[in-house]
Protein backbone atom coordinates (compact mmCIF):
# COMPACT_ATOMS: atom_id res chain seq x y z
CA UNK A 1 0.00 0.00 0.00
CA UNK A 2 1.14 3.51 -0.86
CA UNK A 3 -0.16 6.87 0.30
CA UNK A 4 0.01 9.77 -2.13
CA UNK A 5 -1.85 12.92 -3.10
CA UNK A 6 -5.11 12.24 -4.88
CA UNK A 7 -5.22 12.63 -8.66
CA UNK A 8 -8.09 13.03 -11.12
CA UNK A 9 -7.95 9.31 -11.94
CA UNK A 10 -8.92 8.59 -8.30
CA UNK A 11 -12.16 10.57 -8.43
CA UNK A 12 -14.56 7.72 -9.38
CA UNK A 13 -13.24 5.59 -6.53
CA UNK A 14 -13.30 8.52 -4.08
CA UNK A 15 -16.96 9.09 -5.00
CA UNK A 16 -17.69 5.44 -4.12
CA UNK A 17 -15.97 5.83 -0.75
CA UNK A 18 -17.77 9.11 -0.08
CA UNK A 19 -20.99 7.15 -0.53
CA UNK A 20 -19.89 4.63 2.09
CA UNK A 21 -19.12 7.40 4.58
CA UNK A 22 -22.40 9.16 3.90
CA UNK A 23 -24.34 5.97 4.57
CA UNK A 24 -22.60 5.54 7.94
CA UNK A 25 -23.51 9.12 8.84
CA UNK A 26 -27.09 8.65 7.62
CA UNK A 27 -27.40 5.55 9.82
CA UNK A 28 -26.19 7.52 12.86
CA UNK A 29 -28.17 10.71 12.13
CA UNK A 30 -31.01 10.10 9.65
CA UNK A 31 -32.48 13.43 10.76
CA UNK A 32 -29.54 15.27 9.17
CA UNK A 33 -27.99 13.16 6.39
CA UNK A 34 -29.64 12.16 3.11
CA UNK A 35 -28.94 8.52 2.17
CA UNK A 36 -27.52 7.62 -1.26
CA UNK A 37 -25.82 10.98 -1.75
CA UNK A 38 -22.20 12.15 -1.53
CA UNK A 39 -20.55 15.19 -0.02
CA UNK A 40 -18.97 16.24 -3.32
CA UNK A 41 -19.70 15.89 -7.02
CA UNK A 42 -17.12 14.89 -9.63
CA UNK A 43 -16.84 18.54 -10.67
CA UNK A 44 -16.33 19.72 -7.08
CA UNK A 45 -13.65 17.07 -6.50
CA UNK A 46 -11.87 18.09 -9.70
CA UNK A 47 -11.67 21.66 -8.40
CA UNK A 48 -10.74 20.57 -4.88
CA UNK A 49 -7.73 18.66 -6.20
CA UNK A 50 -6.28 21.98 -7.39
CA UNK A 51 -6.53 23.62 -3.94
CA UNK A 52 -3.17 23.42 -2.13
CA UNK A 53 -4.81 24.48 1.15
CA UNK A 54 -7.10 21.41 1.01
CA UNK A 55 -4.93 18.40 0.23
CA UNK A 56 -6.53 15.00 -0.31
CA UNK A 57 -4.36 11.96 0.42
CA UNK A 58 -5.26 8.50 -0.85
CA UNK A 59 -4.14 5.05 0.18
CA UNK A 60 -3.77 2.87 -2.91
CA UNK A 61 -3.20 -0.86 -3.23
CA UNK A 62 -0.67 -2.64 -5.46
CA UNK A 63 -2.96 -2.04 -8.46
CA UNK A 64 -3.01 1.72 -7.70
CA UNK A 65 -6.71 1.51 -6.72
CA UNK A 66 -7.81 3.88 -3.98
CA UNK A 67 -8.81 1.98 -0.81
CA UNK A 68 -8.97 4.97 1.52
CA UNK A 69 -8.64 8.72 1.69
CA UNK A 70 -8.07 11.67 4.01
CA UNK A 71 -9.54 15.05 3.03
CA UNK A 72 -7.61 17.79 4.84
CA UNK A 73 -7.79 21.55 5.24
CA UNK A 74 -4.97 23.84 6.30
CA UNK A 75 -6.42 26.29 8.81
CA UNK A 76 -4.72 29.31 10.33
CA UNK A 77 -5.62 30.65 13.75
CA UNK A 78 -5.25 34.41 13.35
CA UNK A 79 -3.56 36.42 16.06
CA UNK A 80 -5.92 37.83 18.65
CA UNK A 81 -5.58 39.37 22.10
CA UNK A 82 -6.24 36.06 23.82
CA UNK A 83 -4.83 33.38 21.50
CA UNK A 84 -1.47 32.71 19.91
CA UNK A 85 -1.24 32.35 16.16
CA UNK A 86 -0.89 28.78 14.87
CA UNK A 87 -1.70 26.46 11.98
CA UNK A 88 -3.86 23.35 12.10
CA UNK A 89 -4.26 20.55 9.60
CA UNK A 90 -7.94 19.67 9.92
CA UNK A 91 -9.06 16.22 8.75
CA UNK A 92 -12.39 16.96 7.12
CA UNK A 93 -13.05 13.33 6.18
CA UNK A 94 -11.18 10.05 6.55
CA UNK A 95 -12.44 6.80 5.06
CA UNK A 96 -11.24 3.27 4.45
CA UNK A 97 -13.19 1.05 2.08
CA UNK A 98 -15.42 -1.23 4.15
CA UNK A 99 -13.92 -4.23 2.29
CA UNK A 100 -10.38 -3.20 3.29
CA UNK A 101 -10.88 -2.38 6.97
CA UNK A 102 -8.73 -4.11 9.56
CA UNK A 103 -5.56 -3.81 7.45
CA UNK A 104 -4.22 -0.70 9.26
CA UNK A 105 -4.95 1.54 6.27
CA UNK A 106 -6.66 4.12 8.48
CA UNK A 107 -3.66 4.17 10.80
CA UNK A 108 -1.32 4.66 7.84
CA UNK A 109 -3.45 7.51 6.49
CA UNK A 110 -3.55 9.17 9.91
CA UNK A 111 0.23 8.86 10.33
CA UNK A 112 0.72 10.32 6.85
CA UNK A 113 -1.49 13.30 7.72
CA UNK A 114 0.57 13.88 10.88
CA UNK A 115 3.79 13.77 8.83
CA UNK A 116 2.39 16.26 6.30
CA UNK A 117 1.18 18.53 9.12
CA UNK A 118 4.70 18.61 10.55
CA UNK A 119 6.08 19.57 7.12
CA UNK A 120 3.57 22.46 7.05
CA UNK A 121 4.72 23.56 10.52
CA UNK A 122 1.29 22.92 12.00
CA UNK A 123 0.74 22.97 15.74
CA UNK A 124 -1.92 20.26 15.66
CA UNK A 125 -4.09 17.88 13.65
CA UNK A 126 -7.81 18.17 14.40
CA UNK A 127 -11.08 16.66 13.22
CA UNK A 128 -14.73 16.36 14.11
CA UNK A 129 -16.32 13.01 14.86
CA UNK A 130 -19.99 12.19 15.36
CA UNK A 131 -20.66 10.97 18.87
CA UNK A 132 -22.48 7.80 19.75
CA UNK A 133 -19.77 5.30 20.67
CA UNK A 134 -18.92 4.77 17.03
CA UNK A 135 -15.98 2.80 15.69
CA UNK A 136 -14.62 6.13 14.40
CA UNK A 137 -14.45 7.54 17.94
CA UNK A 138 -12.62 4.44 19.14
CA UNK A 139 -10.23 4.59 16.19
CA UNK A 140 -9.27 8.25 16.77
CA UNK A 141 -8.77 7.65 20.49
CA UNK A 142 -6.52 4.70 19.60
CA UNK A 143 -4.53 7.09 17.39
CA UNK A 144 -3.91 9.26 20.46
CA UNK A 145 -6.48 11.98 19.79
CA UNK A 146 -8.20 13.64 22.73
CA UNK A 147 -11.35 15.72 22.95
CA UNK A 148 -10.46 19.40 22.56
CA UNK A 149 -13.93 20.89 22.66
CA UNK A 150 -17.42 19.55 22.34
CA UNK A 151 -20.31 20.87 20.30
CA UNK A 152 -23.72 20.23 21.80
CA UNK A 153 -27.20 20.53 20.35
CA UNK A 154 -30.79 20.96 21.42
CA UNK A 155 -33.16 19.78 18.71
CA UNK A 156 -36.26 21.92 18.50
CA UNK A 157 -39.33 19.77 18.07
CA UNK A 158 -41.41 22.48 16.44
CA UNK A 159 -40.06 21.87 12.95
What annotation goes with each model-predicted range?
Residues 2-16:
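A short beta-loop-alpha structural element at the N-terminal edge
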Residues 23-45:
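Conserved GNAT-fold acetyl-CoA-binding loop/helix
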Residues 43-58:
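A short helix-loop-beta-strand connector motif used in the catalytic cores of GNAT acetyltransferases and
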Residues 58, 65-74, 95:
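Conserved beta-strand in the GNAT
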Residues 82-98, 153:
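Conserved acetyl-CoA binding element of GNAT-fold acetyltransferases
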Residues 93-96, 102-115, 142:
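Conserved acetyl-CoA-binding loop-helix of GNAT-fold acetyltransferases
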Residues 107, 111, 119, 131-149:
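Conserved active-site alpha-helix within GNAT-family acetyltransferase domains
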Residues 117-128:
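Conserved GNAT acetyl-CoA-binding A-motif
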Amino acid sequence: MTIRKAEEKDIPRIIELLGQVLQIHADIRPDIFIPNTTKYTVEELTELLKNKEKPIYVAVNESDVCVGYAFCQLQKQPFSNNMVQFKTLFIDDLCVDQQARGQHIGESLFEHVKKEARKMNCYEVTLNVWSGKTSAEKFYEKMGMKTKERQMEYILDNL
